[in-house]
Amino acid sequence: MVRELERKQLGADFPQTAPAANPVFFRTYSRRQQIEGTRESWSEVCDRTLKGLVELGKLTQDEALLLEEMQRNLKALPSGRWLWVGGTNWLAQPKNFSGAYNCTSTNVIDWSAFGLMMDLAMMGCGTGAILEPKYINQLPSIRNRLNVKVVGDIGKTIANERREFTETKIEGNQATIYVGDSRDGWVQSYQTLLELSTDERF
């Protein structure tokens, strides 16, 4: 016997002229709540993001009220990135500030630029590389052929044995990279591979 279960439909008061607004909002900007199976409503997203903007901009009460009126009435909105991360504890950490930007661009002049672009991408910030000759001609020449070998199985290290940061050990002409299981760890391991490709010690 098939029984129809009542499904509670989530929705926000978006204009009927914007039929894709609800699915886009709940897919992209509404964060999961502590209670399993629930997501932020439009009102809760407004509460979170407006609070974050007021704190960040040190806004006056009049400025805050104007922003609130504009956002809640869908007359003006912050960036899409801000709708997702604005007002969160994650964004309050200085190392994550760039995650509030929709996009950035980076002059590719050294290997740290590649690390920066990976870090930005892992934060969800769109990042572009400026590859003009005046920049990329500053990159060091590749001089070492790397033979990369993965040791161990991905995902098999138990949680309390995982490292947060990447560590590199060099013995003779062999480098062992212990990849930290974090954004910083992955960025550092990627940048280390690039640096090893031009390292004059080898």
Model-derived features with residue positions:
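Extended catalytic cores of very large enzyme megasubunits
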Residues: 1-202
